[in-house]
Regions:
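C-terminal and inter-domain tail/linker signature
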Residues: 1-156
């Protein structure tokens, strides 16, 4: 295992539900490091770097990242993984909290870590949000998005 891979693996371990070492997580990043949660369209820096770690542990206290494949090329480490845990929520949504179901979830994810001088400079996380929501029993309300077509040229 190379040093950059070891750094990434150690960072993952700090974020597991049975560890929750937020200081260790933050210390894995450069001073100007950023965590981009691509699926949610959110970015975290500084003291907020641990926000998603805390959120995931609240959602799934037994959260664990099962690393399937790890590839390193220079200062880039790419990881294919499953984020696994038990949905003990609640899951906050714009419509209100979704109560926990106690179901086990296994969320396919791809993570890209860009390192500088032995620390994480940028972490881009691509979580399969649709699969996560489906496993939690949260389904899109397509009917509310469908609008009847009216006016000239409308199909009947």
């Amino acid at each position: 295992m190379t040093s950059n891979e070891a750094i990434v693996r150690a960072a993952y371990r700090t974020a597991d539900g049975d560890v929750q070492d937020l200081e260790g997580w933050r210390n894995a990043f450069t001073e100007d490091g950023v965590f981009n949660n691509i699926a949610a369209g959110e970015s975290y820096t500084g003291d907020r770097l641990g926000d998603v770690v805390t959120y995931m542990a609240t959602l799934m206290p037994d959260v664990h990242r099962e690393l399937l494949r790890v590839h390193e090329s220079g200062n880039l480490v790419v990881v294919e993984l499953l984020i696994e845990g038990t949905f003990l929520g609640p899951l906050p949504t714009p419509a209100g909290p979704v109560p926990p179901t106690g179901t086990k979830v296994s969320i396919p994810t791809a993570d890209f870590f860009y390192l500088r001088d032995g620390k994480i400079e940028t972490f881009n996380c691509y979580v399969s949000m649709n699969i996560m929501l489906d496993q939690m029993g949260v389904y899109p309300d397509f009917a509310s998005a469908v609008k009847p077509v009216t006016g000239p040229g409308a199909q009947r």
